[in-house]
């Protein structure tokens, strides 16, 4: 049985309407989830974390038919960030919509994940 490496946090900056947003994607082993936090640059505004629990991530990943585990789901997010296929589509006072573009079998499909309450 091989030991899976513990995923490292992903840090990135996404520009949306000429404002830079700092993105932090973290794997939380104890809570068995991946958290995504978005903070606006040069601002005291701290957006709530998007909490994606294990089951939601597995369901999400099954849409892509790429993985069955939390670690694989994290890898999908990591690849999306590194390939710049993630963008902030809409930000309001209490919601953030993350725009994901994933290429499957040469066809580009677009998915939206809506955040917390």
Residue ranges and their predicted role:
Residues 1-114:
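A structural signal for beta-rich interaction modules in eukaryotic proteins
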């Amino acid at each position: 049985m091989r030991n899976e490496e513990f995923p490292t946090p992903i840090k990135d900056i996404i520009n949306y309407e000429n404002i830079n947003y700092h993105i932090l994607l973290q794997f939380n082993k104890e809570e068995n989830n991946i958290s995504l936090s978005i903070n606006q640059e040069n601002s005291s505004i701290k957006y709530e974390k998007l909490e994606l629990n294990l089951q939601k991530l597995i369901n999400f990943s099954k849409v892509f038919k790429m993985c069955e585990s939390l670690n694989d789901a994290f890898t999908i997010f990591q690849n999306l960030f590194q390939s710049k296929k993630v963008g902030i589509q809409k930000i309001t006072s209490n919601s953030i919509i993350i725009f994901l573009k994933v290429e499957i079998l040469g066809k580009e499909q677009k998915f939206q994940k809506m955040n917390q309450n």
